[in-house]
């Protein structure tokens, strides 16, 4: 081997100096080359696909992961991997479509004539679909004929109607995914970092796993159901200070205090995952980031301990994607969203006005969308999926009809009698209504 070729091989084996600055603590001073390569390998090792994912999708994903690891030697590979991840989404959807329909599907052509297509792979289906000038397939639990163009756009619509992808924020992300795919396919030179490449791979892994029915613990897009602990929220009515802790810890102190307490089920795992809005809890309205359930109160510490020991409430798990909320608009005021069961227990005077049942991943989006509707802002959909907000309006009208629609949409409308109690932080940060001028 010549000296020149030896130097060329050594250059290919050397860690790219740019990768050394991407540390577990963020950008910083350079790590050792071996440590930098090991860190990137350990990152990508966390991305695991479910066992039942289609083999062709798995092979492509593993190829991307291998390319990511090699980015330690060639920094440009991070850009190539991130771009290829955008294109791989369509392959995953194609493979899931082929598996879902089991090799046979009935389609409609433009004249509404039906054709049965028997296929072995998605490309096989696609060729036959074009040949019969297919335009529609049946989608969803209602088996409704819907337009299907067999491209990424149509596949994403199909996956959502079949319940294989979900979440209203993810619906907006899907629109961005389509734009990114097109930008990648017709783009120009650009350079991405390992952070962006890993995010692309991580998101792709979550989407693929969810297409095959598996959520991701701690996931960004499709998180697994999260644990709600029994939490005591206490506040000082004089100073307005608010504290929170596990209800089981209330009995650990011998003395009583002057705080007012309520007990709720809420996401509360200090150091792991907390609800950022827990201190703004309102028993009647949805003000927390994750669903919170009223259990007891208000009362003193002694009373809270007594109820907790007698009732022995247990933690549970909850899913916060695609929740259903109801929200009231009355006399120019947009009120805070409520959970359907709580709204069902309202007195007649509190039921007046126009109500909306809205599907969303959190109450903030519901409130913002309803405020936009009340202010007659352009572009917001009064029914169905909103193009501007990550929400879907299910129904509007009086409370009774809206609750009935919420139940049909899968929401639990069992009546929950909640007291009119909220923390001082809620009074300060989250007014119960705003006045809107249309």
Name each model feature, range by range.
Residues 1-74, 78-82, 226-438:
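Extended intrinsically disordered or low-complexity regions, especially N/C-terminal cytosolic tails and loops
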Residues 46-57, 75-82, 142-145, 149, ...:
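Amphipathic, non-membrane alpha-helical segments in soluble helical-bundle scaffolds
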Residues 75-101:
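Short, hydrophobic, well-ordered secondary-structure elements
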Residues 55-62, 66, 87, 91, ...:
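Generic structural signal for well-ordered, non-membrane alpha-helices
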Residues 90-92, 110-123, 207-213, 227-238:
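Eukaryote-specific, cytoplasm-facing alpha-helical/coiled-coil scaffolding segments in long proteins
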Residues 96, 100-171, 180:
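Flexible secondary-structure boundary motifs
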Residues 69-73, 97, 189:
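Short, flexible helix-adjacent loops and helix caps
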Residues 157-226:
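Charge-enriched, short contiguous segments at helix-coil
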């Amino acid at each position: 081997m010549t000296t020149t070729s030896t130097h060329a091989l050594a250059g290919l084996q050397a860690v790219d100096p740019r990768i050394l600055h991407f540390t577990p603590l963020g950008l910083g001073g350079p790590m050792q080359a071996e440590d930098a390569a090991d860190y990137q390998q350990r990152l990508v090792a966390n991305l695991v696909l479910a066992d039942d994912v289609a083999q062709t999708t798995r092979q492509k994903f593993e190829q991307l992961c291998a390319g990511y690891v090699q980015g330690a030697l060639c920094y440009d590979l991070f850009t190539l991997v991130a771009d290829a991840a955008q294109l791989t989404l369509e392959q995953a959807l194609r493979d899931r479509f082929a598996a879902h329909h089991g090799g046979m599907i009935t389609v409609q052509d433009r004249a509404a004539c039906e054709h049965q297509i028997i296929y072995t792979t998605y490309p096989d289906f696609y060729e036959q679909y074009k040949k019969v000038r297919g335009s529609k397939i049946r989608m969803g639990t209602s088996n409704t004929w819907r337009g299907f163009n067999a491209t990424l756009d149509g596949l994403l619509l199909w996956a959502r109607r079949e319940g294989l992808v979900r979440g209203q924020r993810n619906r907006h992300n899907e629109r961005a995914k389509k734009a990114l795919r097109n930008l990648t396919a017709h783009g120009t030179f650009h350079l991405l970092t390992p952070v962006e490449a890993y995010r692309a791979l991580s998101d792709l892994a979550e989407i693929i796993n969810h297409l095959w029915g598996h959520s991701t613990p701690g996931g960004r897009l499709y998180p697994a159901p999260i644990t709600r602990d029994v939490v005591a929220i206490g506040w000082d009515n004089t100073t307005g200070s608010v504290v929170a802790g596990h209800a089981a810890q209330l009995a650990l102190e011998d003395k009583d205090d002057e705080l007012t307490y309520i007990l709720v089920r809420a996401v509360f795992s200090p150091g792991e995952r907390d609800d950022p809005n827990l201190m703004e809890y309102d028993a009647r309205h949805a003000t927390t980031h994750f669903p919170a359930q009223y259990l007891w109160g208000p009362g003193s510490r002694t009373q809270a301990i007594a109820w907790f020991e007698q009732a022995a409430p247990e933690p549970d798990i909850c899913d916060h994607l695609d929740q259903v909320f109801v929200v009231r608009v009355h006399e120019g005021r947009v009120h805070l969203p409520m959970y359907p069961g709580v709204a069902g227990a309202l007195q007649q005077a509190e039921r007046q006005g126009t109500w909306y049942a809205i599907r969303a991943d959190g109450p903030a989006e519901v409130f913002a969308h309803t405020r936009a509707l009340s202010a007659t802002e352009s572009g917001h959909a009064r029914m169905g999926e909103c193009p501007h907000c990550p929400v879907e309006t299910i129904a509007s009208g009086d409370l009774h009809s809206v609750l009935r629609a919420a139940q049909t949409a899968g929401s639990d409308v069992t009546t929950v009698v909640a007291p009119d109690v909220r923390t001082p932080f809620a009074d300060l940060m989250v007014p119960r209504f705003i006045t809107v001028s249309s």
